[in-house]
Amino acid sequence: MEPDVVEIPPPPLIASGSRTRKPRKAVPEVIDVESYEFRNVGVVKDNNVVDKKNKGKAIQVDSFSFNNVQSHHHGSSLLNLETFQDYYGHKNIPFSEFANQPIDVDDYSMYQDVLDPKDVPAGAEVTVPWGLNSSSKGTAKSSISIMRSQSMKGYGTVSLATTNVPQLWDYTLPQQNQAIYSSVSFSAVQPQTPDVVMVTNPTPNPFSYDASASSSHPIAAEPISSVQDSSNARKLKEEFLRDFKRFDTVEDFSDHHYASKGKSSKQHSKNWVKKVQADWKILENDLPEAISVRACESRMDLLRAVIIGAEGTPYHDGLFFFDIQFPDTYPSVPPNVHYHSGGLRINPNLYNCGKVCLSLLGTWAGSAREKWLPNESTMLQLLVSIQALILNEKPYFNEPGYVQSAGTASGESKSKVYSENVFLLSLKTMVYSIRRPPQHFEEYVQNHYFVRSHDIVKACNAYKAGAPLGSMVKGGVQDLEEARQSGSKKFKTDVASFMQTVVDEFVKLGVKELAEKPEPPMSNANTENQSKKKTRKRSRSSR
């Protein structure tokens, strides 16, 4: 008999051994064997499975749930994604290392007890198509080889504390052609260690029954679409983003740019503490939707803010992080601000070293009313100024020497080229943020880019097809005058060149459908008209 096929004999009147089986009563449509004690596998005790062969020597193993499709590992370093090393040095094992391995499920009688009352005909074969790795060394008289199928692909990245974690798997045999084939739901447990925390079952994988099934036609499972799993994951991530507080406090900021400077809250004056707390209150009540802030309880002088790039700008859908420190003389002087640049200069006011140039900070020229006013200016005003004055639609004109050229043909042309380059740098910033998310924003970064991945890919496809930068709104091309223009040839080529890197990062986040079926290029009126003109010219020349 092949190792991946189990032949189920006709239901005996007398069970194997000397036991006498009592007549069966009517069984419900679904039998849940979780209520059994799994006497053929081990004894459940205190939510753990004790293996009889290992004499009860217990090793506690962390569990995880497949119902939760979100990735919970912390942000990794720039070049350490494959091993999923988090900020605290916890090395998590990639799911792919153990999910492709076969396992042997011993004690055929466990299945026999469940399937006997269902009158499965002799010669019918059941192929169980997916499962996890087993390290069990015990021998068995009969076994089933369970292999991982494509239906596993939709679960995204899962962080585990150990490789050898046994799981509960559901299999369903739905009624189709004959009334005697009721739905049977059972769970197979193969303990890797004496004590194991029981975990939640995934959604049952539907089997399709074939009445003509024989030794050469096993009953096979239809894989669950990864697109459906991704849709469920998207709902969870959208819910996470909705519930994510725009302002909150955290315990520490070990990776903060100003962590090594300043002092603890207890060493500041009462007036300083009172002013900072007033800023906290304003941020908590009045932060706009596109800005989120985290303040440090043990170091009240530290803040971290993230701003979402606005639609219609070369920064759309991106995340831009800023580390902020209140000086000892605050509010007599403005806060110190450092931009997480990743070595990229995406704006005349945002240097690749992290310096932020703004009149409100005293790092840029401006009128008296544009500078920091100790009795009036607030932290909220500073963040909104960065959002509106720096991360704007035409950052080229942020440079004082170029302001006078705004509205001229030459100035607008140069601004267009500059903005196209900024968008490419914004894509690189996305990759940088995904690979190295700032502390306390790890899940936020992952969920944000998971949810926005399709809009970003659609925008890239539109730009490749000739749509002008900034014309994409909610995944579609705006029907505006500027939408009848076209992006430069270099811009289209550069977007096409770097786009795959961005898509690869989205796939690592769990957006599997981008790898299976890339988004089709977006078309706009401009590109369609150009193709029609070319067709007309060809037809005229042929005459």
From Swiss-Prot:
Residue span(s) of domain UBC core: 271-431
Catalytically driven reaction(s): S-ubiquitinyl-[E1 ubiquitin-activating enzyme]-L-cysteine + [E2 ubiquitin-conjugating enzyme]-L-cysteine = [E1 ubiquitin-activating enzyme]-L-cysteine + S-ubiquitinyl-[E2 ubiquitin-conjugating enzyme]-L-cysteine
InterPro entries with a match to the protein in the record: UBQ-conjugat_E2_core (IPR000608), UBQ-conjugating_enzyme/RWD (IPR016135)
Name of the top EC class for this enzyme: transferase
Comp. bias regions, Basic residues: 532-543
SMART domains xrefs: UBCc (SM00212)
Catalytic site: C357 (glycyl thioester intermediate)
GO biological process: protein ubiquitination
Positions in coiled-coil regions: none
Pathway involvement of the protein, from the record: Protein modification; protein ubiquitination
ATP-binding keyword on record: yes
Positions of the UniProt region annotated as Disordered: 1-21, 514-543
Keywords: ATP-binding, Nucleotide-binding, Transferase, Ubl conjugation pathway
Organism superkingdom: Eukaryota
Gene Ontology MF, one: ubiquitin conjugating enzyme activity
The EC number(s) this enzyme carries: 2.3.2.23
Function: Accepts the ubiquitin from the E1 complex and catalyzes its covalent attachment to other proteins.
Family: Belongs to the ubiquitin-conjugating enzyme family.
Protein name: Probable ubiquitin-conjugating enzyme E2 26
Source lineage: Eukaryota, Viridiplantae, Streptophyta, Embryophyta, Tracheophyta
